[in-house]
Amino acid sequence: MDHRLLEIIACPVCNGKLYYSQDKQELICKLDSLAFPLRDGIPVLLETEARALTVEESHS
């Protein structure tokens, strides 16, 4: 994941900062507790494609 891209993209739900999870290949919005997938290295920033983070994931 290109770190320059992380500086300019935002959560499509709340416009908050996204964090890259290398082990799960997801972009994480901590404010909304959502994880957006990467497909072939491309972020899929659609609310319908996001998964809800578990309580454990939200607090890590």
UniProtKB/Swiss-Prot annotation:
Q: Which Pfam families match?
A: Trm112p (PF03966)
Matches recorded under InterPro entries: Trm112-like (IPR005651)
Q: Show the SUPFAM superfamilies listed in the entry.
A: Trm112p-like (SSF158997)
Q: What's one GO-annotated cellular component?
A: cytosol
**Mind telling me which Gene3D superfamilies this protein's record contains?**
2.20.25.10
Which family is it part of?
A: Belongs to the UPF0434 family.
- State the NCBIfam families in the record: PRK11827.1
Q: What is this protein called?
A: UPF0434 protein KPK_3615
Q: Which organism is it from?
A: Klebsiella pneumoniae (strain 342)
Q: What is the lineage of its organism?
A: Bacteria, Pseudomonadati, Pseudomonadota, Gammaproteobacteria, Enterobacterales
